[in-house]
């Protein structure tokens, strides 16, 4: 199994790509970051078995390309001030262009990167798309939920970077939200050591913290409010395969959000899966194998 990394030049920066591949694989998946973390924090995560989720996929016939878009993880350089889903998709399409040819290529987004694989699927860059904890809205939803949009706008300015850390993640998201919803932490015993290992090499890592573009986090509301589209013609998804997953106890992405995503793209060939016994962070929790198996089955079908 080959586990190298490389950079793809894009505008005034370099996109970091970490790949996990195996000889003879004819399928690939390009995995995107979450709100602030590298895709590696989710998929190149070893739950204590000695093998990461990405390595499981590679051993099953699926090469895995985990991409740090500009402003994330180990990427380098300057990002555009207006960091939106089209700019993000342009970066990923550049990575796809430089990849080896495969019989089937899928894209996987998580929560805040929901729109990006869908944009690329509509544009014809991908053969299928996977989104874990889908978070996507239209203009009507944004206008009907002013309190929510104001809360998000208050959480991030329109430019620059915001800083976070493992301590903030534990305090603000895990302890207060995910863990309280399910009653007790479900994370595997190796979680903290694995997360420390995966984040300490970030280009922006400093004193146990890292940064991510603020503008990108707001794309979920600024794009539909200013463009009145999802970033593509929904008709271009006709019959195309999409998998939406959600943790059974995912309080951060309610079931109604998944249902709404299915309604938006009802013309596509959509599959859904609820990951039993997990929260928003299923890949870190004891129920991780069901999540990995579901994604693997979809990518191989």
Predicted regions and their residues:
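Catalytic histidine-centered segment of alpha/beta-hydrolase-like enzymes
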Residues: 278-289
